[in-house]
Amino acid sequence: MDYLSLSLTMIFVLIALFLSKSFKAGVEKDMIIATIRAAVQLLIIGYVLSLIFRGDHPVFILLMVLLMLAVAAQNVIKRKKNTIGSFWRVFAALAIVEIVTQGILLSLHIIPLTARYVIPISGMVIGNSMVLSSLFLNRLNSEVGVRKEEIQLILSLGGTPKQSIQRILTSAMKMSMIPTLESQKTLGLVQLPGMMTGQILAGADPIQAVRFQLLIVFTTMASAALTCVILSVLTYPSLFTVHQQLKQNE
């Protein structure tokens, strides 16, 4: 696709702007900002990746992954609803998930240690974990607020902080994983995933594209569960005081 063809796809943005204006949705400004940011960010990352792919040095790969982790963690904690999250807890959770998934893929020689493989797969894993982290923390924050009396009752009966919040953590984990699981159930029937579509458009054999897509599906499923479990372990102690009481501002 050349830049002329790409510019013609702006028709879809104009359609969205027209509909927003017609129905008084009031999101025209957000659409314009989102479009400009997406175009600029993707073009910049495209040129950066071209340089990294040419160098293909582990240090450049590591720096790129660290940047993705930092941006993802910041995006999660900047949401006002995630009041019980912190940058370093989220960053640590995302980093652990990345280390585990990439460690397995590289140690079993499923993918080679090259930028062309590690960076795109890391982006998908971190992106999926970022969404899961946001959903999990939102759900946990809301559940703690609604079930505060239940937590305090269990604590008053001699229960530990972990016991008082275990059911809430389980519920938050289940609800935050539902979108990922439901999306995976319809792969190939309702939607063709991004990596598979991209490879097919680039001329790859469809079966080869399916293999890589299944790699992503299995990896994101594991990363989803890992993200929730690690965030549970790292986050729940922050809800309680040193005297094992629920913090009043939660």
Swiss-Prot record:
It comes from the Bacteria. Keywords: Cell membrane, Membrane, Transmembrane, Transmembrane helix. One of its GO terms (cellular component) is plasma membrane. The keyword Membrane applies. It is a multi-pass membrane protein. It is found in: Cell membrane. The chain crosses the membrane at residues 3-23, 32-52, 57-77, 91-111, 117-137, 214-234. Belongs to the UPF0014 family. This is UPF0014 membrane protein YjkA. It comes from Bacillus subtilis (strain 168).
